[in-house]
Amino acid sequence: MDNRTARFLKTRFQKYYKNAEIGLPDHLPNREWAFIFFDSMPDKMMHRHKAFGSPGEALDYLYGMAPAHVYNSTAYYEYPDARKMNEKNWLGAELIFDLDADHLPDAPKNYADMLELVKKETFKLMDFLLEDFGFSEQEIELVFSGGRGYHFHVRSPKVLKLGSAERREIVNYLSGRDLDFKYFFREVAMDGEFGTGSKTFKGMKNVPFKCTLVGYDSGWGRRIALYLTDYMKAECGKRYKKDMFPELRRYEKVGDTTIKKLISLTNSENGLKDILEKGRLDFDVRNFKDIAAYFMRESVEDFLHRFGTSVDEPVTADIKRLIRVPGSLHGGSGMLVKKLALSELEKFDPLTDAVVFGERPVKVTVLKPFSVQLKGKDLRVEEGIQEVPEYAAVYLICRGVAEYGHRRNQPGPV
């Protein structure tokens, strides 16, 4: 990035920061801040160990300096501006999750498709936080990163003092990597508060057992019930019986009679409903518990792809992490780091809703062919001098595929 291009971006960012609504963190005086300035680009030298005593001080700094990237600590410190980390006196930290397309298997290369995939992962993580961990919506802050994903900030006394090891355990739970299906498919005693039917014969108590899906109504048990019943419905929706349940036909305990009973169970009035709502596995299908457990083991990769979520483990485990500030601009895209209510995620379109610059025509020198969709328009540029809307110019320059103005001996638009 040449000096003229850096100056152009800085003036555009400064104009934005003049009236920007910045999501300043709670306990502002206890947060460390860090910045990358346009003057250091493209080296991206980070200036950190900065602290602010008041909102006005922080906002004045952003307007005056117009940084390319703005971060604050997820941790709370007694002395956030201390130059050495061991002198800051760590007081606790938010629980942070970073969902980025870089960490998703087979993420599409197209930017719009990439963001759509990350949004689906974001919904899955939201379900974990609200349903499995029981955090309230008021304890969760959702932020579009301004780049390729989303950040979750969990601010709760329950997580404040968690160490790195405990935070890694949470990541493991989210991924499902340590799931043991034997735990979920079990025989449970029908005695006492769990049921009736115990009998005593010759002084010996006989306690009957029933096959059940443990935890069917919450957490991973609920996801197993959904996956299993969805599979059974899909198989019975096939046209020919010979094509149904091919995965189960490979199991030694499954023959033609079992397949017929599985079809009958699936098509019955309450069969799948009983699995979902009661965790029931004691049907007129021999070894149904073992068959279900076998299917889950064989399908574990697809199951975890559907229900697990891939967060950036080092980010969550780091109790002294720096993260982008909501309301700031992402120097790698020029887009807004935007805070969202959880209810806003469904309709949120980052390629429109996180674009803050206007339509004023700007001449740029495109360094290589590039295409992207912004503000509902397909933008395609070729190498050479191009005139594009300001929002597109900022994006192209931040992505490193264009420079401001025009160079000599560069071809103009055809």
UniProtKB/Swiss-Prot annotation:
Complexes and interactors: Heterodimer of a small subunit (PriS) and a large subunit (PriL).
PANTHER family: DNA PRIMASE SMALL SUBUNIT
The protein, known as: DNA primase small subunit PriS
GO molecular function, one term: metal ion binding
UniProt keyword Manganese, yes or no: yes
Cofactor(s) required, per the database record: Mg(2+); Mn(2+)
Keyword Cell wall biogenesis/degradation set for record: no
Purpose of the protein: Catalytic subunit of DNA primase, an RNA polymerase that catalyzes the synthesis of short RNA molecules used as primers for DNA polymerase during DNA replication. The small subunit contains the primase catalytic core and has DNA synthesis activity on its own. Binding to the large subunit stabilizes and modulates the activity, increasing the rate of DNA synthesis while decreasing the length of the DNA fragments, and conferring RNA synthesis capability. The DNA polymerase activity may enable DNA primase to also catalyze primer extension after primer synthesis. May also play a role in DNA repair.
Gene name of the record: priS
EC number: 2.7.7.-
Main enzyme class: transferase
Entry keyword set: DNA replication, DNA-directed RNA polymerase, Magnesium, Manganese, Metal-binding, Nucleotidyltransferase, Primosome, Transcription, Transferase
Active site: 98, 100, 312
GO biological process, one term: DNA replication, synthesis of primer
The family this protein is said to belong to: Belongs to the eukaryotic-type primase small subunit family.
Entry's Gene Ontology cellular component terms: DNA-directed RNA polymerase complex; primosome complex
Gene3D superfamilies given in the database record: DNA primase, PRIM domain
